[in-house]
Amino acid sequence: MEKNISRRIRFEQALKLGDEFGVTRQELTKRVLKKEKYEVYTLFQINVVANWGSTGRIAEEIGQMAIKCGWKSYIAYGRGKPKSQSKLIRIGNKVDMYRHALISRLLDNHGLNSNKATRKLIDRIRDIKPDIVHLHNIHGYFLNYALLFDFLKDAGIPIVWTLHDCWTFTGHCAHFIFIGCDKWKVGCKHCPQKLSYPTSWLCDRSHRNYKIKKMVYTSIPNLILVPVSDWLAGLLRFSFMKEYSIRRIYNGVDLMTFSPQGNTLQLRRRIGVIQRYMLIGVASVWSARKGLADFVALRRKLSIQEYAMVLIGLTQKQIQELPQGIVGISRTNSVKELAEYYSVANVFVNPTWEDNFPTTNLEALACDTPVITYQTGGSIEAIDEKTGIIVPTGDVEILTQSVRQICEDRIIEEGQCRKRAIELYNKNDRYKEYMSLYNELMNSLHK
């Protein structure tokens, strides 16, 4: 009896949400009766991590939205010990991952190992019979993409693939803007980033990898690509994936968590910036590509008496090497504390040389903090003239001028950044776009 009541409540929730996603109650009821259960469809996501890091959280929250809409949700992942509202499936184990990484470093064949783990995954997919398979990052030493796609090409399951970087259509690297490489457009070889992720110590098989990826990925008849920025969508149209349908869906943020924090005076006192303008920079890993050297150069241009500078996400070694006038903070696990740092800052500076669509820009906007970014990849798409400034990549002089414009001239009106975040980057709105896409695919199959 209790189970039936629970099912009825979930079904009523699915009907209510179904209205939002363009699925009529008649159609939804028909699907329920056809399957004789209240979980209307089954979503199966694959990502290197689950409920951790940016891509892991995105997969988790898409799964949560699917569950709210009456779907069953599975997430298959490669590493970690996550908790999830979805049903989790671990792909392989640590030993398998280390073996995959070692072979990849020796033979430059990243993504072509983990055979046994991938076959077990395929068996689980066969057993579960999902209605949608949603791929995220399938690189990271945990999966054999050739085996997986050989199964998917004949499985008849609609495939959605969210692209968070460029690894899919290159012969080796995940990013190439920093070094200005265009070999991926015609066929990679003599890779200038052989020692970058995924590192290869000995071989350069980028040309072979490129050909294998092209053959494997273009074998799928029912694939929709979902880049998370217009910039990445533009690159796809020059890649060997250009014939596939492309649907850009931006990432979003939790607007309840990332919001203007009221009492920031205590934080300012703690870091000693009560009467100064404050710049903030945030990264999960700081490197030259993320603009660490640019922050050091910017520090020399701005008066220490007038401007405080705080960088979050540094290693202890990096903190020790910082010049005077930069406060270094290691990675914070408290999202509330991170929101406080965004809120207390006068401007969020993101001098990234290579990025797809950085979530940090969105988090800053949600806390009503203006953003300055280099003219890099999809980073510029987060802002407009009312919410920030775009600076030519590497131009520290203009970067300095932009900081002064926002802090001293106050060219950004209070409330505009938060308004843009609400209108464009509410994570629930973005996940509803995924649900609409899923329902489009399901409706097309039932016509």
Which sequence ranges carry the predicted segments?
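Conserved donor-binding/catalytic core segment of Leloir-type glycosyltransferases
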Residues: 226, 272-290, 296-299
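Nucleotide-activated donor-binding/catalytic signature segment of Leloir-type glycosyltransferases, i.e.
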Residues: 313-336
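Short acidic/histidine- and often glycine-rich active-site loop of Leloir-type glycosyltransferases
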Residues: 320, 375-390
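Short hydrophobic beta-strand element within catalytic cores of glycosyltransferases
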Residues: 370-373
